[in-house]
């Protein structure tokens, strides 16, 4: 009987034309994709996408935050997108953003992971972890940052010292055109390095420069089209050369750098006298040798890299935007310098306490953040359980993107939404906080380094404005054009830093 059945199947298989098999296979895959991605009842409206890739090719990967704005007008303040294998919704408007990120944050607390991100982090660290791992790592990171100076005079003094190193590095340019990218990266990175590694690096240190270069590359390469194709077809793309392979190589080199730093720490580690984040983490690991918590070597590497990345890229990118806008708006730069001269003078180092007496400078920094808009769709969240938002059903696993671009350019909130205008943050000459200003997000998953970033921005920006006037090079035109990556950064440009007399 079995032999007869097998013979019959073999006969049928042999009779089938390869074209028939191909059509059957494609039909099966299309049906599987349809049933996997079909919209549930009360799901937010949105554009129909192609099988397997969804709406990816309907977005401009050079400016995805801008290409979704017409969809807001068409579908409303909450609409859906299918980004390959990831179902997502985009929310627009302060009321909806507040509801999603604060009032309902227990339901929308997780972090979605692309295939690429999961391979890189394995759900570890601070940025891309969720659940108990995230809670443990965030609590420990906040405590350790405070223990090693956050909000204290000691860290402020480190910022002042680093600002003086940055001033001297820029002074060496002698007022000639230069690219400020890595000078600023060096300075900002050294602050978080002093907390994580317990030391600052010389600006010419080859290991330090290599680490910053690798980080800068992955910031851009992770958002390229070929990287997105890897997220959709990893079983194919892993065999194909391309920029996605460089992303993995770079992250392995970054992990190796941190691993070597950890080994160096172990050589003279004293658990009773932790010097930095790595020492403190090593001590925490000894409390849980059975790996009952997330305090293990893999999380130490990932959390250290997350602090290094978050503590370097966002602040340094904002400072680069700040210098660019000062060169583009010399009248604003003059007002900032006049306030600095009046409150601080030309000799004394800037202090955080000066910020209260410098409303215009503070307003300029905030306006740079608004216009720079460096994380235009916020860091994504993921729905942890089936949730209803604004009358729409969001199934568990849906990615939530926050439309900060629309919020920071809302004509109902800002007098001149598309024009650099520090008056947005001033009222009767005093600094004015704005509710529709969320560069650090909101809720429990808001940026844990917000206080550090605000302090760095003020100290570094004020120190540079105190010592230099920034101008466009002769016969070179500057513009606020951006390069898309994990953050929006200014396109590569040169600038002149003329010492002030």
Swiss-Prot record:
Keywords: Endoplasmic reticulum, Heme, Iron, Membrane, Metal-binding, Microsome, Monooxygenase, Oxidoreductase. Heme binds at residue 447. Its EC number is 1.14.14.1. One of its GO terms (cellular component) is endoplasmic reticulum. InterPro entries: Cyt_P450, Cyt_P450_CS, Cyt_P450_E_grp-I, Cyt_P450_E_grp-I_CYP2J-like, Cyt_P450_sf, Cytochrome_P450_fam2. One of its GO terms (molecular function) is NADPH-hemoprotein reductase activity. It comes from the Eukaryota. It catalyses: an organic molecule + reduced [NADPH--hemoprotein reductase] + O2 = an alcohol + oxidized [NADPH--hemoprotein reductase] + H2O + H(+). It is found in: Endoplasmic reticulum membrane; Microsome membrane. One of its GO terms (biological process) is positive regulation of tumor necrosis factor production. It holds the Pfam family p450. It is a peripheral membrane protein. Its cofactor is heme. Belongs to the cytochrome P450 family. This is Cytochrome P450 2J6. It comes from Mus musculus (Mouse).
